[in-house]
Amino acid sequence: MPRYKLTVEYDGASFVGWQRQKNGLSVQEVIETALLAINGAPVGIRGAGRTDAGVHASAQVAHADLAREWRPDVLRDALNAHMRPALVAVVAAEPVPETFDARFSAIRRHYLYRIINRRAPLTFEAGRAWLVKRRLDARAMHEAAQVLTGRHDFSTFRAAECQAASPIRTLERLDVQAVGDLIEIRASARSFLHHQVRSMVGSLEMVGSGKWSAGDLRAALEACDRRRCGMVAPAAGLYLTGVDYPEEGEEKGAQPFFGE
C-alpha cells in the first residue's frame, strides 16, 4: 500500500486535541473521516505530535497508507474538500517510503508560543495568543531561557500524567523575541515532554514580570519537582510549526513525542 506524508494546518480551538477521544471531535478524526471517503476503507493515521485541546499547528505531519496511488495535489485537494467546514487543511501531500513514520522518524520538532503583552483585550488574536497585561521584559526572559537549553532532567516542566519513560530531554533552542506588543517564544528539540513547552513559557513569564530571576528558574529546573514550576501557559498561544526528518544517511529519530 502506498504511503503518503501529509502536512497539516489546523485551528486547535475547534478540537479536543490531535488524538481521537470520546469526549469530542479531534483533528485525527476529521482527517481519518476524509480518508475513508476517498479511500473506500478505513485508514488510520499517525501524527508527529499529539497536540492538546486548543493547541494549533501550521505544520503538523502525519502519514497514511492508502489503497492506491494518488497524484499529490489531487490527494491534497480531495482531502480538503471532504474536511470542510472543519478548520483543518492539508497543505501538502507527498509519497514516502513505507519505512517513513511521521512520529518515530522525526529528528526535531519546532514550537512557537505567542504572547500579546498589552492592557487591551484581544479581538483578532482571541484564542490564538496568551494575553498578559503586566509588562514583560522579553530580554530578561530570553537570557533566562538559556538556562533551560541543553540536556537536562525536565521533571519540573512535565505534566503529572506525562507518559514518557524518562524526563531527560535535550532542548536545542529556546529563544524569546519581542516585536511591539507581540512576544514570540520558539523552542526546538528532538522530542518534548507533555506540557513541557507551556510549562517553560509559564515560568519564563514569571521572569519577565520580575517575580523570578534567572537563578530562580535554574533552581526550579534543578529541583526536578513539578511543584517548583510556574503556571502552565494557556494552550491558545501554542503552535506546532515544523517537524524535521533525516536526509538520506542520517540517523532516524528514536524518541517518541508525547506532547507540548
From Swiss-Prot:
The gene is truA. This is tRNA pseudouridine synthase A. InterPro entries: PsdUridine_synth_cat_dom_sf, PsdUridine_synth_TruA, PsdUridine_synth_TruA_a/b_dom, PsdUridine_synth_TruA_C, TruA/RsuA/RluB/E/F_N. The active site is at 52 (nucleophile). HAMAP family: TruA. Pfam families: PseudoU_synth_1. GO terms for biological process: tRNA pseudouridine synthesis. It comes from Beijerinckia indica subsp. indica (strain ATCC 9039 / DSM 1715 / NCIMB 8712). It catalyses: uridine(38/39/40) in tRNA = pseudouridine(38/39/40) in tRNA.
